[in-house]
Swiss-Prot record:
Alphabetized UniProt keyword annotations: Cell inner membrane, Cell membrane, Membrane, Protein transport, Translocation, Transmembrane, Transmembrane helix, Transport
Record family assignment: Belongs to the TatA/E family.
Organismal lineage: Bacteria, Pseudomonadati, Pseudomonadota, Gammaproteobacteria, Methylococcales
Subcellular location(s) of the protein: Cell inner membrane
Record protein name field: Sec-independent protein translocase protein TatA
Region (Disordered): 42-70
Predominant location: membrane
Complex and partners: The Tat system comprises two distinct complexes: a TatABC complex, containing multiple copies of TatA, TatB and TatC subunits, and a separate TatA complex, containing only TatA subunits. Substrates initially bind to the TatABC complex, which probably triggers association of the separate TatA complex to form the active translocon.
GO BP field: protein transport by the Tat complex
Transmembrane segments: 1-21
Role according to the record: Part of the twin-arginine translocation (Tat) system that transports large folded proteins containing a characteristic twin-arginine motif in their signal peptide across membranes. TatA could form the protein-conducting channel of the Tat system.
Residue ranges, compositional bias (Basic and acidic residues): 57-70
Keyword Secreted: no
Organism expressing this protein natively: Methylococcus capsulatus (strain ATCC 33009 / NCIMB 11132 / Bath)
Amino acid sequence: MGIGVWELLLLFLIVLVVFGTKRLRNIGGDLGGAIKSFRQAMSENEDKPSEGGARTLEGEVVDKKEKDKV
């Protein structure tokens, strides 16, 4: 009991009548442009290494009690 082909076709025709072909074309173009911009932003983000990433610290671990004795 899902949506069949005829129901989808009827829904498309109703949307076409309500909005018109020109408006649907504009909406489709805007949606495509938004998706393209989103993909470009995601690929740019993957190319850049993060500056706030993890750093390796080197040194000697000293117990606080031993430090006070010296």
